[in-house]
From Swiss-Prot:
Cellular component aspect of the GO annotation: extracellular space; plasma membrane
Entry keyword Transmembrane: yes
Gene: PRRG1
Alphabetical UniProt keywords: Disulfide bond, Membrane, Transmembrane, Transmembrane helix
Membrane topology annotation: Single-pass type I membrane protein
Chief subcellular location: membrane
Lineage: Eukaryota, Metazoa, Chordata, Craniata, Vertebrata
Transmembrane segments: 84-106
Cytoplasmic side: 107-218
Disulfide bonds: 37-42
Name this protein carries in UniProt: Transmembrane gamma-carboxyglutamic acid protein 1
UniProt KW GTP-binding keyword: no
């Protein structure tokens, strides 16, 4: 008897039916075993119960198993696609972000170079010439006007520039500004000397007449 009848656990393992996802529509539309087996997995025992004929059951089962193998192969192909497509898409997004960051850095660097080339630096060897101070300029605490201090600073800069160029030191006249005066005194006179008569006449004309002083004795 044990060979004919199965226990409850073994019978449930063989004749087990899984609940369908569209159980509500199954009550409205009564289906057949072929459609049910295509929509969900079924066993050989379920097919034999539906057909109640071994030949029809074997014919259906051979076509059903072949169809299941083909769908499993197509499913494995789609599984590889579903696995590789997100990886390729994520790699593309990472490369796009890196390219945009590199583009922004390159644009900022080009803009900085353009600004640097367009800026003309002020030459260091040129001195700034300040205008003369107004007559009503206020003197500082040392008693010297800022204009005089600027003149002294400019002359000291010129003297230091000469010394830096390995020129001989300036003379006293160059340092005090009496070069033009000395040159005017040492230049030869081109006019002829005056005559004696001209000197006498000029002296007599410029002489002050002397008024005699009269004294009275009492």
């Amino acid at each position: 008897m044990g060979r004919v009848f199965l226990t409850g656990e073994k019978a449930n393992s063989i004749l087990k039916r899984y609940p369908r996802a569209n159980g509500f529509f199954e009550e409205i539309r009564q289906g057949n075993i072929e459609r049910e087996c295509k929509e969900e997995f079924c066993t050989f025992e379920e097919a034999r119960e539906a057909f109640e004929n071994n030949e029809k059951t074997k014919e259906f089962w051979s076509t059903y198993t072949k169809a299941q193998q083909g769908e499993s192969n197509r499913g494995s192909d789609w599984f590889q696609f579903y696995l590789t497509f997100p990886l390729i898409f994520g790699l593309f997004i990472i490369l796009l972000v890196i390219f945009l960051i590199w583009r922004c850095f390159l644009r900022n660097k080009t803009r900085r170079q353009t600004v640097t080339e367009g800026h003309i630096p002020f030459p260091q060897h040129l001195n700034i010439i300040t205008p003369p101070p107004p007559p009503d300029e206020v003197f500082d605490s040392s008693g010297l006007s800022p204009g005089f201090l600027g003149y002294v600073v400019g002359r000291s800069d010129s003297v230091s520039t000469r010394l830096s160029n390995c020129d001989p030191p300036p003379t006293y006249e160059e340092a005090t500004g009496q070069v033009n005066l000395q040159r005017s005194e040492t230049e030869p006179h081109l006019d002829p000397p005056p005559e004696y008569e001209d000197i006498v006449n000029s002296n007599s004309a410029s002489a002050i007449p002397m008024v005699p002083v009269v004294t009275t004795i009492k």
